């Protein structure tokens, strides 16, 4: 069986400890084709080489964004005949892989994959297909967790704070939650509704601003936030949660999220969907304006984002 191992060397763990990349390279000798990548161009080239060689298993390693970018590049290179996919988490959060039950040190996980050989177990996992219309053209990605509104605004703060992993994210959440009861400026920066229009399966939702827009194919979005508590229920229909509550009403409902229950409230949408689109309004003097969205921790922007079910992956379980 041909195996390709693709490492994102810019992932935080590998930047801090580059010897880990060397360990993976040595472990792959005689067992897999090894690719060390630094950017999307090198990632695309590695996936194209793997596809041309008929690789049966592509192992990705990095953070959640690396998994999203790698899955996107694999889908682009292989088309409908996708290989099995392995993932070795090496980012700050590793949210998707935790939902998949994959945890451990990259070298140990890779060794288990090699030793299992033909006995490797696989699980089927759904994905999102995300099409973004931007000033640069149309961008298509395959990912797992999409969000705008408070999701995008939270990540803006998270990166401003230095992307300090789960501990840093927890501190931000605690401050937002505390301030939401009194309408503090920090909480309002994140929780106040964001102007946008949303079409769900061809029907326009009634509001013109939303505080939360989130769709995912995994249930725990980090820190035990179970916003998309029905994710994965139907691989062809992602779970979409939309809410328009103002800061003072939305913040206190965090307990609903932790319990994996509907947030509720006037103007809310909560269900499985075939497709939805988020359209950001043009600002004064501009024909088209872009708004922020997040896909697997990567902060992006577009004028229109359309989300539907992506390909189902066969993911190896080390």
Sequence positions of predicted segments:
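Short glycine-/acidic-enriched loop or helix-start segments at secondary-structure transitions
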Residues: 69-71, 97-98, 224-225
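ATP/NTP phosphate-donor binding region
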Residues: 1-61, 66-77, 107-112
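Catalytic core of DAGKc-family lipid kinases
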Residues: 34-37, 76-211
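Short N-terminal binding/cap micro-motifs at the start of the first secondary-structure element
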Residues: 12-16, 153, 222-223
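Glycine-rich phosphate/pyrophosphate-binding beta-alpha loops
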Residues: 147, 151, 212-229, 299
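Short, solvent-exposed amphipathic alpha-helical segments in soluble enzyme
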Residues: 20-23, 75-76, 159-160, 229-232, ...
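ATP/nucleoside-binding phosphotransfer catalytic cores, i.e., glycine-rich phosphate-binding loops
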Residues: 5, 200-207, 224-318
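Cofactor-binding loop segments of dinucleotide-utilizing enzymes, especially the Rossmann-like FAD-
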Residues: 8-10, 90, 243
């Amino acid at each position: 069986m041909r195996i390709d191992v693709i490492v994102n060397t810019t992932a935080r763990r590998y930047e801090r400890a580059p010897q880990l990349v060397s360990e993976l390279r040595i472990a792959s000798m005689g067992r897999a084709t090894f690719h060390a990548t630094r950017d999307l161009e090198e990632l695309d080239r590695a996936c194209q080489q793997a596809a041309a060689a008929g690789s049966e298993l592509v192992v990705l390693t990095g953070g959640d964004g690396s998994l999203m970018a790698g899955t996107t590049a694999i889908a682009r290179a292989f088309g409908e005949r996708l290989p099995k996919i392995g993932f070795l988490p090496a980012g700050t959060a590793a949210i998707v892989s935790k939902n998949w039950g994959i945890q451990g040190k990259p070298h140990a996980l890779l060794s288990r994959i090699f030793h299992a050989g033909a006995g490797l177990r696989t699980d089927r996992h759904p994905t999102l297909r995300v099409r973004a219309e931007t000033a640069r053209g149309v961008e298509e990605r395959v990912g797992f967790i999409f969000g705008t509104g408070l999701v995008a605004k939270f990540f803006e703060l998270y990166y401003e704070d230095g992307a300090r992993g789960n501990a840093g994210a927890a501190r931000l959440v605690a401050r937002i939650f505390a301030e939401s009861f009194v309408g503090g400026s920090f909480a309002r920066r994140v929780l106040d509704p964001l102007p946008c229009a949303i079409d769900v399966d061809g029907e326009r939702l009634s509001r013109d601003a939303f505080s939360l827009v989130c769709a995912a194919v995994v249930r725990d979005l980090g820190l035990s936030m179970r916003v998309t508590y029905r994710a994965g229920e139907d691989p062809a229909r992602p779970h979409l949660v939309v809410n328009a509550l103002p800061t003072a009403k939305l913040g206190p409902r965090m307990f609903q999220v932790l319990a994996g229950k509907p947030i509720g409230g006037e103007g809310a949408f909560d269900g499985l969907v075939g497709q939805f689109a988020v359209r950001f309004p043009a600002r004064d003097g501009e024909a088209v304006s872009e708004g922020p969205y997040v896909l697997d921790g990567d902060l992006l922007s577009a004028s229109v984002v359309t989300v539907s079910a992506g390909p189902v992956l066969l993911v190896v379980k080390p």
